[in-house]
UniProtKB/Swiss-Prot annotation:
CDD domains with a match to the protein in the record: F1-ATPase_delta
Cellular component GO terms held in the UniProt record: plasma membrane; proton-transporting ATP synthase complex
Membrane topology reported for the UniProt record: Peripheral membrane protein
UniProt GO molecular function: ATP binding; proton-transporting ATP synthase activity, rotational mechanism
Keywords: ATP synthesis, Cell inner membrane, Cell membrane, CF(1), Hydrogen ion transport, Ion transport, Membrane, Transport
Protein name: ATP synthase epsilon chain 2
Protein's cellular compartments: Cell inner membrane
Family, as annotated: Belongs to the ATPase epsilon chain family.
Length: 152
């Protein structure tokens, strides 16, 4: 019994994988689909998500990020046509760029945020002092017969 299947993954941009795989997991519209050799024929849309496959010759797990598409399973193999896709190294590079960008943004805002936090703390302290003064003044002006709990 054959333990691998022909798998082709293509996108508008490029052919991403063409070879034999032990299995592939794709994000189907109704949930994750695990496809093994000799799977029943199937034609379905896929939703955005991660495609995971195990390369038959090497046993290496590979991951791709897809932005939707179509999956066809036939006797001849599996074909995934993705609207758009990224290989894991491209995805890692994208994440690295995004992390650097976020860190740069944070550094640029850091001094400003601290200044705002300090201003907020000062404003709160001033407000609390004004509230304390208000209650102190209100208590001084209150006549002895106006005290809460006294019968009038």
């Amino acid at each position: 019994m054959k333990t691998s299947m022909k798998l082709d993954i293509v996108s508008v941009e490029a052919a991403l994988y063409a070879g034999d795989a032990h299995f592939v997991v794709v994000p189907g519209e109704s949930g994750e689909l695990g496809i093994y050799p000799h799977h029943a024929p199937l034609l379905t849309r896929i939703r955005p998500g991660v495609v995971t496959l195990v390369d038959a010759p090497t046993g290496e797990h590979r991951r791709l990020l897809v932005a939707g598409g179509v999956l066809e399973v036939s006797r001849d193999g599996v074909t995934l046509i993705a609207d758009h896709a990224l290989r894991t190294p491209e995805l890692d590079e994208l994440r690295t760029r995004e992390a650097r960008h976020a860190a740069d943004d944070w550094r640029q805002r850091y001094a400003h945020e601290n200044r705002r936090a300090f201003d907020f703390a000062s404003a709160r302290a001033e407000l609390m002092e004004e509230i304390r003064r208000f209650f102190a003044m209100a208590l001084r002006q209150q006549a002895p017969h106006d005290k809460p709990g006294s019968a009038g």
